[in-house]
Each structure stands twice: as structure tokens, then as C-alpha cells.
């Protein structure tokens, strides 16, 4: 039994998987390593004590039980202590970084103040020298004392007050400018933090919805194992249930892809793919052939995700504006690429698909099929909106730094990692059964119609 110290505060479990704390100094890393060593020592001592309790005479089982209860409480306290220590450490290093920045800004401000004071002194000397030269040119023999004597005491005091007032006003302006800069930096940091939190919420909701569907499919498979059914009928129903799970995985990834796109440019379905026709085919459109013209110096202008190793087809996750894929107008986010120039991509892995797509030149023919995830969604209107109507997005536009060259390899770390941790068994079962298909929670007897279209489309092959 282990204390199982949790991840450092700020580590996320969103679509991008667990994220390490940003900006942790080397001291913070060593602190986490120290905690890890301490946790291992605690686990070792915990196991030793548990073994000692197991050697107590069975007649004294009450002592063993109470001892293990106390050990459980001790383990829980140690885990919470580790979590709090990690949180405090991260906050401490964040404050240290802010302190370094403030010290640097203070040093620069003090240096600027000294420079300005020297410049003012030099300007006054130059003004005094210029006045003396002016009087010398006009033939007047006047020294500095005579110039000062021309000013009345009242005028000197007024001049000093005016200079002091100007200085106060300029200090206020400089202070406001400095505060604005600090607030802008803080706002940018908070926006990035909110973007990460929104990504975690978005990914968690997608994963929870997918797991709910997959759990229903797995329960039906367990029920199928309890039936007295063998031979082709058993295999057919089993494959249909796998088809349910696979298509829902497909649709979940498409939702993640669409969540990354700009809300000002809503995703459009291909012509002829209205909601009524898509509902009849469970959100899966017909196979389309799209021609794309690409110059040698250009990329395709698309980003892809998925692959055989993830249990989903090669999906278009993003179309870059102004690139060949955008100009042709026939490709859409959510399209599954079945083939390109006659090369079958149904059974290819992600890296293989990237290589094949990057090698295409000139006139390229895509064989794609469109899948609409919202058709099968039971809460399509509010799935990613909160009570205020704000839609959860994966990333802010200014935080995205992806390139547009070729078939950009996003390696599904943004859209797929949230599924990899949950459905490795599902992917393994899918590869063994060699099947793809539809998603849903319908009873066993109702799954045939939902999976038939996908079976005919992909010849019962896993992507």
C-alpha cells in the first residue's frame, strides 16, 4: 500500500495529458526529486510495517486491523503533506521569479533616475553658459551673479513651485504607465493560465462523455459473453459493439479538433450533408473524391491526427487559411482520409500517413468521408458552454504556434492523449477484432443498422 503522492499543483490532466509546472526553477526540480525519494522511503517503510503486522498471531487480529487502519490514515496524511509541499514549493518559486523581475525593474528605474538627474544638471549648466554667451555677444558684461540678481525672490519661488508641480505630474504619469505595464503582464499570465484550465475542462468533459459511451458498449459485450451464443452470430454482435465504440471514439476526436478552431469561422459541412441525411446514416456521410492542386513550394495546408495505433482513422484536424486545402474548398475539418492518389490510408499509422501525404505533388486526389459528431450528441447545444454562455476552447489564438508546412504532424498529442490514457484496452481489442463502426448506447438488437454503413465503408478493417 503506497502513499501515492499526487502530481505537483498545476499539473493538468486535460487534452494534452499531464502538464509539468511552467517556469519551475532548478531548485524546484530538486525539491520534487527530494519528495520523490522521500516518498519511496515512506513506501518501503510502510510495506515493512505492513509485513510486520501480518506476522502477528491470528488470535490478535484486532490489533492487526487497528494497526492497518492507523497506517492508512498515516498514508493519507503523508500524501496530503506531499501535495501541500509541492504546492507551496511551486508558489514559492513563482514568487521568487516575480521578485527577481521586480528587482530588475527597480534597478533599471534607479539607474534611469540617476541618469535623468545628471542630464538635468548638465542642461542647467548649458543654459547658464548659453545665457552668458548671449550677453557677451550683445556687448553686455554680465556675470552669473548679475543674471541671478535680475530675478526677484518671489519669481524664484514661483519657478521652484512650478518645477515641483511639473515633477509631481510627470511622476504620476510615469507611475500610471508602470502600473499599466505590470497589469498587462499579469493579465497575459492569467490568460495563459485560464487557457490551460479551459483545456483541462474541455478534455475532461470529452473524456467523460466518451468513457460513458464506451462503458455502455463494454457492459453490452459482457452481457453478450453471458449469453448462450456461439459461432458467426456471436462474432457479428461482438463486432457490431466494437463498431459502436470505434465510431464514438472517432466523433470524440473530431469534437476536440473542432474545439481548436476559431469561433468566428464556424465549421461548415460539405454540400449535400444536411442534418436529416446525416441522421439517417448515424452522422456518416458518403465517400467523396476531392481534387487538390499543389505547387512544389507549397504544403498541403492541413493538419492531421489519428492513425491505426490510436484506433481512429486519419482525420483532418485543421485547415490552414490560404493554403491549397483551403483553396480547393472540398476538404473539411472532421473528414477521414481513406486514400490519397490511390494509396490506401485506412490501415496506416500516424507517421506513415504524414510521410505519404508529404510526398504528394501536383494534382492530388483525396478519398474522404465526413463524420458529423453533433448528430449523435444528446446535448449538442450546451455541451461545451457554461451557464454564462461561454464556450470552452482548447487554446487561445495567441498561444498557438503551429506551422502550415506540408501535412502538419500534430501527432495527436493535443486531441488523442486524453483518450490514450483511458482506452488502451479498447484500441487493443479493436485491432484484434479488425473492426470499425458506430457509437451509441442502444441495446444489442438495435446495433446492426448503426454499424452496417461503417462495415460496408471500411470492409471491416480497423484504421
Curated annotation (Swiss-Prot):
Keyword terms of this UniProt record: Acetylation, Cell projection, Coiled coil, Cytoplasm, Golgi apparatus, Membrane, Phosphoprotein, Protein transport, Synapse, Transport
Where does this protein chiefly localize?
cytoplasm
List the membrane topology term(s).
Peripheral membrane protein
What effect does gene inactivation have here? Male mice are infertile with globozoospermia. Spermatozoa display a default in acrosome formation and are unable to activate oocytes.
Give GO terms for biological process: autophagy; protein transport; spermatid nucleus differentiation
Q: What is known of its domains?
A: The coiled-coil region probably mediates targeting to the Golgi, oligomerization and interaction with RHOQ. May also mediates association to membranes and interactions with GOLGA3 and STX6. The PDZ domain mediates interaction with ADRB1. Also mediates interactions with FZD5, FZD8, ASIC3, GRID2, CFTR, CLCN3.
Subcellular location(s): the record lists: Cytoplasm; Golgi apparatus membrane; Golgi apparatus, trans-Golgi network membrane; Synapse
Protein name from the UniProt record: Golgi-associated PDZ and coiled-coil motif-containing protein
- A Pfam family matched in the record: PDZ
Please name the SUPFAM superfamilies in this protein's record. Answer: PDZ domain-like
Residue intervals of the PDZ domain? 289-372
Q: Coiled-coil stretches, from where to where?
A: 85-201
Return the Gene3D superfamilies for the record.
2.30.42.10
Whichever gene encodes this chain, its name is Gopc
Q: What quaternary structure, including any partners, is listed in this protein's UniProt entry?
A: Homooligomer. Interacts with FZD5. Interacts with FZD8. Interacts with GRID2 and BECN1. Interacts with CSPG5. Interacts with CLCN3. Interacts with STX6. Interacts with CFTR. Interacts with ASIC3. Interacts with GOLGA3. Interacts with NLGN1. Interacts with RHOQ. Interacts with MARCHF2; the interaction leads to CFTR ubiquitination and degradation. May interact with CACNG2. Interacts with CCDC62.
Q: Which domain of life is it from?
A: Eukaryota
- Role: Plays a role in intracellular protein trafficking and degradation. May regulate CFTR chloride currents and acid-induced ASIC3 currents by modulating cell surface expression of both channels. May also regulate the intracellular trafficking of the ADR1B receptor. May play a role in autophagy. Together with MARCHF2 mediates the ubiquitination and lysosomal degradation of CFTR. Overexpression results in CFTR intracellular retention and degradation in the lysosomes.
The tissues where this chain's protein is expressed are given as: Ubiquitously expressed (at protein level). Expressed in dorsal root glanglion (DRG), spinal cord and brain. Isoform 1 is preferentially expressed in whole brain (at protein level) and cerebellum. Expressed in spermatocytes and spermatides but not in Sertoli cells and spermatogonia.
Indicate where the modification N-acetylserine is found in the sequence.
Answer: 2
Q: Does the keyword Oxidoreductase apply?
A: no
Instruction: Output the Gene Ontology terms for molecular function.
Output: frizzled binding; GTPase regulator activity; identical protein binding; protein homodimerization activity; syntaxin binding; transmembrane transporter binding
The secretion signal range is none
Residue numbers of Phosphoserine PTMs: 402, 405
PANTHER family per record? GOLGI-ASSOCIATED PDZ AND COILED-COIL MOTIF-CONTAINING, GOLGI-ASSOCIATED PDZ AND COILED-COIL MOTIF-CONTAINING PROTEIN
One cellular component (GO) term of this entry: protein-containing complex
Query: Taxonomic lineage of this organism?
Result: Eukaryota, Metazoa, Chordata, Craniata, Vertebrata
